[in-house]
């Protein structure tokens, strides 16, 4: 068995531990940050700017003539990793398909944006609305009519966000 030699005595280490150098370094760091300009945002009164790619509440869009854009291709339903979208469709008299049911369960949705990216006609979009709530679970279950109402109400903001994001697409 070999004996372990004790570490040699060092005045430098003794001075560091005795004089509490690390403590004063920490206090200096705290002191430097204590007098800097505050960056806290007082949320309800002040709002930070949102990115054009911010993903908030979903909306269904319409064409300028008032017809809904969704062609019931069901790509958004297929690509949704959280299985939050439910679509049912039927054929019209002219042979085109349209949705009879388009539901999004926001309690399941992870706001990944895959539904928006997969839509070939830009029907489903995610708005910049993030201030919404529900008092019970069913309040966060959006039907086709509710999604169309959101799209109609915020069409100007949606179009502006799409235009700002166009250079990145």
From Swiss-Prot:
It catalyses: a quinone + NADH + 5 H(+)(in) = a quinol + NAD(+) + 4 H(+)(out). Its EC number is 7.1.1.-. It holds the Pfam family Fer4_7. Its main location: membrane. It is a peripheral membrane protein. [4Fe-4S] cluster 1 binds at residues 70, 73, 76, 119. It is an enzyme of class 7 (translocase). Signal peptide: none annotated. Its cofactor is [4Fe-4S] cluster. It is found in: Cell inner membrane. Binds 2 [4Fe-4S] clusters per subunit. SUPFAM superfamilies: 4Fe-4S ferredoxins. Residues 61-90, 100-129 form the 4Fe-4S ferredoxin-type domain. [4Fe-4S] cluster 2 binds at residues 80, 109, 112, 115. PANTHER family: NADH DEHYDROGENASE [UBIQUINONE] IRON-SULFUR PROTEIN 8, MITOCHONDRIAL, NADH DEHYDROGENASE UBIQUINONE IRON-SULFUR PROTEIN 8, MITOCHONDRIAL. Belongs to the complex I 23 kDa subunit family. NDH-1 is composed of 14 different subunits. Subunits NuoA, H, J, K, L, M, N constitute the membrane sector of the complex. NDH-1 shuttles electrons from NADH, via FMN and iron-sulfur (Fe-S) centers, to quinones in the respiratory chain. The immediate electron acceptor for the enzyme in this species is believed to be ubiquinone. Couples the redox reaction to proton translocation (for every two electrons transferred, four hydrogen ions are translocated across the cytoplasmic membrane), and thus conserves the redox energy in a proton gradient. This is NADH-quinone oxidoreductase subunit I. It comes from Verminephrobacter eiseniae (strain EF01-2).
């Amino acid at each position: 068995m070999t004996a372990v030699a004790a570490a040699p005595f060092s005045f430098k280490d003794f001075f560091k531990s005795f004089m509490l150098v690390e403590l004063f370094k920490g206090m200096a760091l705290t002191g430097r940050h204590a007098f800097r300009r505050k960056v806290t945002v007082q949320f309800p009164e002040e709002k930070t700017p949102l990115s054009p790619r911010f993903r908030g509440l979903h909306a269904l869009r319409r064409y300028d003539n008032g017809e809904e854009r969704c062609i019931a291709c069901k790509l958004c339903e297929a690509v949704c990793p959280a299985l939050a979208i439910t679509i049912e469709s039927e054929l019209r008299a002219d042979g085109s398909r349209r949705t009879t049911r388009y539901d999004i369960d926001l309690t399941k949705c992870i706001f990944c944006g895959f539904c928006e990216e997969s839509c070939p006609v830009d029907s489903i979009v995610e708005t910049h609305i993030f201030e919404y709530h529900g008092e019970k679970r069913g309040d966060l279950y959006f039907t086709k009519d509710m999604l169309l109402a959101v799209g109609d109400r915020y069409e100007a903001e949606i179009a502006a966000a799409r235009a700002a994001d166009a250079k990145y697409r």
